[in-house]
Amino acid sequence: TWSACGYGDGCSPEPEKELTILSCGHYRLLRLEKLHTVRIQGRRDWQLLYVAKARATFPPAGGAGKTGERCGVSPWRAQDYFYLLKEAPEIYWIHFTGERAEGLLEEWGLFHGHSCFVGEQDRYLRCFEEIIQELQLQPPGFQRLCALRFEELLLSMGRQRLRLKNPQLAGDSLVIQV
């Protein structure tokens, strides 16, 4: 398994704070046949998974998450998901907490349901990679920048989801021809 992870050392899940990014990472299976995660009692924070390549399996209710899908897990919810080497998955994940967490997910239509298709965009990967780097290096202001990048990620996913649901919005990007 190859991974790049960043942890907000000293950041404890404090739901009373507005938004705190606790950890973020990127998995790619190289040799391990199956990476299986089971958390019977869940975690005390929120989690968002994004399938950047191939697929992940979220049994029993979630089914298979394919490229371009995101899966959200609320606090204390049981978790059971796995990735298989033969499917060559590439997954980004982030754990977060705070008073605004649920509201941000709901605002962009990413709260209800276990998973939803948000498409493939380089912007998502850049947001994840920047958050990972900030958590690894921890320069001054890293927590605030991580929260801002995460909000950008959610906004981008929510906006893309709206475009996919409503074809009339697909052309709402500004196009400049020279």
Residue ranges and their predicted role:
Residues L30-T37, D80-Y81, E102, L164:
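A short, acidic/glycine-rich surface segment
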Residues G62-W76:
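Short acidic-glycine-tyrosine-enriched beta hairpin
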